[in-house]
Structure formats: structure tokens, C-alpha cells
Amino acid sequence: MNITIGELIGNFILVAGSFLLLIVLIKKFAWGNITSIFEERAKKISDDIDSAESARKNAEVLEQKREEALAGSREEAATIVETAKETAEKNKASILADTTEEVSRLKQKANQEIAQSKAEALRSIKGDVADLSIDLASKIIGQTLDKEAQSQLIDSYIDKLGDA
């Protein structure tokens, strides 16, 4: 295979011409499509980056809202606990006051019942003492006193006993 310089130069010119023709054809028919594909791809990448940035900002806003809601919930929980404590204290005071009032009322009722029982016992004792005194006086004196005189005598005697 002997190739001469003329053939080499001819082949070179043919290949170079074909290459230049191919470049011109690509430039005329395909270059616009190729550049538009690259531009669309660059635009899509740019839009995706913008969309990701927007999503990140939205996520930050949502995170901030969640933090605010959580803080609000904590504050509301603290308020509920404080209100419950205050209500419990009020109920405690009310129950304590009611209990104290009930104890006082029961004491007063017991004192009244004691006083009433004491008065009834004294009346009963007065009657018994009066009867015994009349019997005793009748036996000692040997005579019968009329009821009014006996009653006055007994009342004065009982009053003296009550004062003692």
C-alpha cells in the first residue's frame, strides 16, 4: 500500500470538506434544536432549583407555625393547669368552710340538745324532789300541807339548791 502525497492531500481535502459540510448542515438544520434542548434543560434545572428553594421556604414557614402552635399549646396547658389549681384551692376553701360551718352547727345542736336534756332532767328532778319533800315534810310535821304552800316551799328549796 503505497499512498502518495497527492492522494493524502486529496483525502485530506475530501475529509475536511465533508467535515465542513457536515458542520454547515448541522448548523443549519440541527443546531437550533440542540441549543433549544440545552436551553430547556437549563431552564428546567433552574425551575427545579427555584421550586426546591420555594419548598424549603414553605417548610421553614410550616416549621415556624408548628413551633408557634406548640408554644401556644404549652401556654394553654399551663393555663389549664393553673386554672385547675385555682379551682381546687377554691373548692378546698369552700369545702373547708362548709365543713367548719357543719361542725359548728352540729356543736350548737348538740349544746341545745344537752341544754334541753338538762332542763328536762331538772324539771323531772324538781318534780321528784317536790314529791319526796312533801312526803318527807308530811311525815316530819305530821300534817298535810296544801298544794300551794307545798309548791312554794319546794320551789324556794329548789331555787336554793340551783343557786348552790
From Swiss-Prot:
Q: An example Gene Ontology cellular component term from the record?
A: proton-transporting ATP synthase complex
Keywords from UniProt, A to Z, are: ATP synthesis, Cell membrane, CF(0), Hydrogen ion transport, Ion transport, Membrane, Transmembrane, Transmembrane helix, Transport
Source species, domain of life:
Bacteria
Q: Which InterPro entries match?
A: ATP_synth_B-like_membr_sf, ATP_synth_b/b'su_bac/chlpt, ATP_synth_F0_bsu_bac, ATP_synthase_B_chain
Report if keyword Cell membrane is assigned: yes
- Give the GO molecular function terms: proton-transporting ATP synthase activity, rotational mechanism; proton-transporting ATPase activity, rotational mechanism
Residue ranges annotated as transmembrane are 5-25
Q: How does it sit in the membrane?
A: Single-pass membrane protein
Main location class: membrane
Per UniProt, subcellular location reads as: Cell membrane
> SUPFAM superfamilies per the record?
F1F0 ATP synthase subunit B, membrane domain
- Family indicated by similarity: Belongs to the ATPase B chain family.
Q: Tell me, what does this protein do in biology? A: F(1)F(0) ATP synthase produces ATP from ADP in the presence of a proton or sodium gradient. F-type ATPases consist of two structural domains, F(1) containing the extramembraneous catalytic core and F(0) containing the membrane proton channel, linked together by a central stalk and a peripheral stalk. During catalysis, ATP synthesis in the catalytic domain of F(1) is coupled via a rotary mechanism of the central stalk subunits to proton translocation.
What is its quaternary makeup? F-type ATPases have 2 components, F(1) - the catalytic core - and F(0) - the membrane proton channel. F(1) has five subunits: alpha(3), beta(3), gamma(1), delta(1), epsilon(1). F(0) has three main subunits: a(1), b(2) and c(10-14). The alpha and beta chains form an alternating ring which encloses part of the gamma chain. F(1) is attached to F(0) by a central stalk formed by the gamma and epsilon chains, while a peripheral stalk is formed by the delta and b chains.
Its recorded name reads ATP synthase subunit b
Species of origin reads Streptococcus gordonii (strain Challis / ATCC 35105 / BCRC 15272 / CH1 / DL1 / V288)
